[in-house]
Amino acid sequence: MGPPLKLFKNQKYQELKQECIKDSRLFCDPTFLPENDSLFYNRLLPGKVVWKRPQDICDDPHLIVGNISNHQLTQGRLGHKPMVSAFSCLAVQESHWTKTIPNHKEQEWDPQKTEKYAGIFHFRFWHFGEWTEVVIDDLLPTINGDLVFSFSTSMNEFWNALLEKAYAKLLGCYEALDGLTITDIIVDFTGTLAETVDMQKGRYTELVEEKYKLFGELYKTFTKGGLICCSIESPNQEEQEVETDWGLLKGHTYTMTDIRKIRLGERLVEVFSAEKVYMVRLRNPLGRQEWSGPWSEISEEWQQLTASDRKNLGLVMSDDGEFWMSLEDFCRNFHKLNVCRNVNNPIFGRKELESVLGCWTVDDDPLMNRSGGCYNNRDTFLQNPQYIFTVPEDGHKVIMSLQQKDLRTYRRMGRPDNYIIGFELFKVEMNRKFRLHHLYIQERAGTSTYIDTRTVFLSKYLKKGNYVLVPTMFQHGRTSEFLLRIFSEVPVQLRELTLDMPKMSCWNLARGYPKVVTQITVHSAEDLEKKYANETVNPYLVIKCGKEEVRSPVQKNTVHAIFDTQAIFYRRTTDIPIIVQVWNSRKFCDQFLGQVTLDADPSDCRDLKSLYLRKKGGPTAKVKQGHISFKVISSDDLTEL
């Protein structure tokens, strides 16, 4: 079974269709009438708009003619260019467009059974975390008999015009589509997770390793059903659609339709002086202005391949507007890359995406307030929702996406479309269970852009450990809803931090409720003991307080280890010390290298300290070789840390 389906306006497609067939009438949607209010909020019309059904526009109308990806699309007189690009991208992956256009064969016109046609269609969108079905009639706006929004160059094909109408209904009207980015639209069509890559900032033309790493990510994304598109920045409006020296258009979005690592045969190795080539195939959704550089149809490289070579290598093109180019030229010519990962179907049972709905709310009590504003508001910043997740191993790429609820439907009331939003990421203690209240020792691991777009994201390779993500609006004291999604190749156990301190319970009251909270960061362990000169030392930390302990990752082959390991403990009394032990990880039996014992009283200095290691037995035990550098902070206010 698929995810639960929400019915927009509570309209049930099959019931409405059967009623129309029974009454021998065509459906007219009472919730999205063929009127100017369905077109614009207050914009002047460029001419008289007449709403027509497809059979009144052309002979033999169809939802889809042949292959959905075979025909070019046009944005129309009043249409939206990002919408056409998103349609072209959607058509690349059948698994996506058949979900957005459900039961497309059943919805198709059948000239043999005209009595079964009721002028009603349904489409599905991923709307703020829920798959939502939208029902529409087939009345489309025209001026002088021509569709004013998007249409296909196959003049009797209507899937994109009808899909665009359903999307406009979902968002309020056609004008609500203004300002949407191509990634906004693709995400709404597919539920994918979008990441925008700055090709120039990535320096892929200079850094060979990064270039092939990018290829690997794109290949994996595409073969798993993801959608990818790219564009060339235009510095100003005058250069929009201006052709480059190699035939590409500035400010124009191209869709990736294939990606291949091709091993060349013996004859071709001699021709191209390479054993393999990395290639991408792109499509111009408007079907004009193709690439004219290397590997284009007019290039020397292309001419050196026979038709049989191209077929065997997979260098084929299915329609006009498609072209191949090398990875090097791809990285050199395009500035922005939109990568939309298919995260709806976990691979091999692994949960790659975790998501949570949340909201910014206002309360006079600082511990209850959840609208503290951005990082600039230091006194209130942590009065925002907080989410913790765990990266189980070093070096995993984590993509974090924060989407605010779309307010376009309220535009008629004068409300803004979007607030300025963003988020901060902090590396925190390995055993943190409660909310952050002050940032004393936490590492600021990342920050998103703060901007008034619907979605902001951050992509980072993170070290092993716990991270707290704080989603914020730029200004404090405002309310709204948001959707937080985190994608990683390993489960990260995303959960919200809701409590400020340990709960009062019969159990902890009987044992003694905590009176002191202590935060410790062990920066390093240095000059550690070696029994003989060529011994390998692989140190790690064990930080203990009572029955609770935190263990650091192992540092390989060093007597000068940098840890920056954090822990936090809620203690009944300072009589329960904090013990930091250093161990050497060995194959059969780990070796104890020494420890320090700390009272960690609230009155103690909070600066960085260094202490020699000692044998077991407390702060007066015999000194051993080596010392640790650490910072410890204690407070009798359980909500200070």
From Swiss-Prot:
Changing residue 358 to R: In a colorectal cancer sample; somatic mutation. The keyword Cytoplasm applies. Expressed only in placenta. GO terms for cellular component: cytoplasm; perinuclear region of cytoplasm; spindle microtubule. Residues 344-495 are annotated as: Domain III. Residues 26-343 form the Calpain catalytic domain. Pfam families: C2 (PF00168), Calpain_III (PF01067), Peptidase_C2 (PF00648). SMART domains: C2, calpain_III, CysPc. GO terms for molecular function: calcium-dependent cysteine-type endopeptidase activity; microtubule binding. Residues 498-621 form the C2 domain. Keywords: Cytoplasm, Cytoskeleton, Microtubule. Coiled coil: none annotated. One of its GO terms (biological process) is microtubule bundle formation. It is found in: Cytoplasm, Perinuclear region; Cytoplasm, Cytoskeleton, Spindle. Interacts (via domain III) with microtubules. Interacts (via domain II) with ARHGEF2 (via the N-terminal zinc finger). Microtubule-stabilizing protein that may be involved in the regulation of microtubule dynamics and cytoskeletal organization. May act as a regulator of RAC1 activity through interaction with ARHGEF2 to control lamellipodial formation and cell mobility. Does not seem to have protease activity as it has lost the active site residues. Belongs to the peptidase C2 family. This is Calpain-6.
